[in-house]
Amino acid sequence: MGPDSTLALGEGAVRGRLELGVCLRGGRSVASRQFHEGALRVLRPHYLDESGQVGYVMVNPGGAYLGADLFLIDVTVENNAALLLTTQSATKVYRTPGSFAEQRMSVRLGEGSRLELMPDQLIAYREASYRQNSRISLHPTSSLIMAEVITPGWSPDGASFKYQEVRLRNEIWIDDENGAKLLALDNLLIRPPLGDVTGMGFMEGFSHLGSLVVVDPRVNQGLADELDLIARDFDAYTGMSLTATIAGSTGLVLRSLSNSTEELNNLLGACAGVLRERWYGQAPLNLRKY
C-alpha cells in the first residue's frame, strides 16, 4: 500500500503503521517480526559494532506529519535482544488546521533486553499541533535509553513559538510476575497560544527542549549526579529527577533547555555515550546521517 493511502482504524484513519519484533539468534539480534503499511517503514538492519545490537532506521516517505495524520508504532524486544531505533531525518509537523497529528507507540522489553530509542528532532512549524503517546513496558532486568529533542520550525516573522501545541506523554511500566506497576508518567505539554512560554519558569527564555529517559537497574543517585556534571559542560539549562524503584529498576529523567538543536543533541549523546561505554563496552553513537 502506497504512502498516499489511508488505513481504517476505529475512530479515524491511520496514515502509517509499523510493527517490529527483535529476538536474539546466534549471538546477534535480528528481526523476528516486521510489518509496515502506509507511510512508515524501516530500512535494512545494520550493526554498528560487534556487540550484536541491531539498528533500524524508521522512514516516513511522505517527509512530514499533517493534520489528522495518525501513526502507529509497535516494538517488541524479546529476551536478551538489543535494538537501536532511530529515524532517517527530523520529524516535521506542519499546519494542522482544526485537528492534530498524532503518533502512538507501544513498546515491550523482555527479560535482559535493551532498547535505545534515538530519533532525530521533532520540528513543529507554524500552526502545528502534535501529540505523541508512548506506552513502554519493561521487565525489571531490561534497559531503556530514550532521547527526544523538540525545536520550533521557521515562521515568516522569525518568532520561535508559532505552533499551537506539542504534547508528549510517556507511560513507563515495570512488568513482572506480580503484574504491571507504573514507574513513571512523563507528560510534557507546550501550548504557546495560551501563555508566554519564553518567560521565566517554563522555557526560561530558551526555544529548544531536550529530554533523556533512562530506565535500568543500575540507575541511582550517583549516576544522576554524574550526568548532571556532564550536562554542565554544554550551553544548556538542565534539570534531573529520579523515579521510585520498582522491582529493582529505577528511572531517570533529564530535561535540558537551549537555543540550539546541535547543543542538545551533543548533550544527550554525551550522556547516552557514557552509559553505552560503561554498561556495554560500546562507543558513543555515530549514526553518520549527515
From Swiss-Prot:
One of its GO terms (cellular component) is cytoplasm. It is found in: Cytoplasm. InterPro entries: UreD (IPR002669). Its main location: cytoplasm. One of its GO terms (molecular function) is nickel cation binding. Keywords: Chaperone, Cytoplasm, Nickel insertion. Pfam families: UreD (PF01774). Required for maturation of urease via the functional incorporation of the urease nickel metallocenter. HAMAP family: UreD. Belongs to the UreD family. UreD, UreF and UreG form a complex that acts as a GTP-hydrolysis-dependent molecular chaperone, activating the urease apoprotein by helping to assemble the nickel containing metallocenter of UreC. The UreE protein probably delivers the nickel. This is Urease accessory protein UreD.
